[in-house]
Amino acid sequence: MKLLLTLLVNCLLLLYTHYDYIVMGDGELKEFIYILCNLFTIGFDASIVTLIVYTVKNKHAKMAISGVFWLWCMVNVVYLRHFNTYVDVTMIGEVRNFDMLGESIWALIRLRDFVVSAAYLGAFYWVIYRLTDKKEWIKWYWMFVPIVLSFLGIYYANSRIQSSSFFKTFSWWGGDFTSNTYVTAYRYGFFHFIYSNLYTLNMHRDKTDADAQAMQSLEKQRKSEAVKYAADAPLPDNVIFVLMESIMSEAVTAVCDGDSVMPNLARLANEAQYSNLNMASEVGIGWSSDGQLIYMTGILQHSIKLTVNAFTYNSFRGMGSVCKELGYATAMVIPTGKHVWHQNDMCQAYGIDSLYNTVKHGQDYDEALIDSTIHVLNSYKNKRSFITTITISTHTPYSHHFSKRLRDYQDKHFVEQQLLYFERANYFDFHLGRLIDALHKNGQWDNSLIILASDHHDGDWTDREHARIPLIITGGFKLPVQKHDKTQIYQTDVYLTLLGLLHVDQSWRGVGKDLFNPKSHRLSPKEKQRISDIVLETDWFKK
């Protein structure tokens, strides 16, 4: 009786943990027809927790384990409401990164959280301390073990029973508990996930003849498209890459309450030598980390695994490495801890030598980030530099007012989430204007190549297929062609375009298209992914 009650309570807590994931609208309705097999999976995961609790004999230890399980679930509930994802394993130890939750913590907590927490902990206390018939629970325990083992056999033997997931990300116990909503390993439950990870934790493999043929074919194609650069072709003094969090093209052009939401970015788009508000997002399950990977390396993220976790120590022909070979100092400024999403390790992989973060400033968001970026730019004023800065204030959620907002938007032409998103976009735009003013004031605008690009789309009022993100290339460095481009482009085009602007002649040129080279052609989506997986799985550039 005790064990079955414990199992039931754990199941209910898991169901509650994933409740917000469903109501966010991230689940696909067609998957709900699999409710029975997915409830089976929830029960199976809860069974694991129950077995752990009842393998321990000490009552206080049982209660402690239950408390840890409750705490982890509630942390994920609150974190999910803010970031639309569960807590990633890389967040552990990066407590300061949770400062971003500070301003909205009370807006994120619901009354039902307290009710569920009290019910769960109260039920566990009653089961552990009040039901004292040891012979009874021992008997149930040993009956329960073969049942769980039978579940395992049935579940693994017939994995098709789990053709999709009711909660998509229900088994986050074993490692990459992130927004891996399309990874099939998460669709088969806890033990299947652990079993598969024993064999796929290391995704690296040896190069094959087929790999070599694919890469040689790509290199041959790139050679046929190549432009010959003069040995004395001019280079910009600075390359400044502003990687904008969740900035959508609609925000750049939006007028709300009679005013431009992002006047500085809109002006840059209008005055830029090159601008395109029709860039398609190509990120996968890693979202922001994938966007950074695409821009820095010219490849897509891995087709299955979370790239920054599975391929952290790969070698790449990163933009940092390319710029260093041209004599540039390299640095990145970020708003999170250095180890979040393995940022420190990924910077090394991209060839970026110095990493600065503003996490000590807590909730100053992009104000502190831009201050730090200006300081870093000043410190590199007398040398060529490649500086990347990654913004944060426009991150989800768009469910409550932004404490640092400069405007309270009321325009009834937009849904509430858009208005809340505009608050954040307007705040970021103000501080972007400060950065642009500082570049002009310090004389660093005149011969700089400045790239502003969004990491991915966002917003529940739109979808990936129709959402577009901006690419703006500006600064005083003269581009070969000046135009406001309306054709559809892709994130993978940026890497090869930058190689062309920096007159880099190398065999690896990414999977995209050079936007300034009419002879250049991008690969098909299928071929892009194939080449990207080869580069990642074989660690193609490892020496």
Regions picked out by a protein language model, each given a short descriptive name:
Residues 427-466, 495-502:
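Metal-dependent active-site segment of extracytoplasmic phospho-/sulfohydrolases and closely related
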Residues 263, 321, 371, 375, ...:
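Feature representing long, continuous alpha-helical segments
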Residues 415-431:
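Active-site-proximal segments of metal-dependent phosphoesterases and phosphodiesterases across multiple
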Residues 316, 338-341, 478-543:
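Membrane-interface soluble catalytic domains
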Residues 146-241, 246-415, 423, 511-515:
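Active-site-proximal alpha/beta segments of enzymes that process anionic O-linked groups
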Residues 1-191, 195:
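Transmembrane and membrane-interface helices of multi-pass
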Residues 233-235, 464-468:
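Short, flexible loop/turn motifs enriched in small residues
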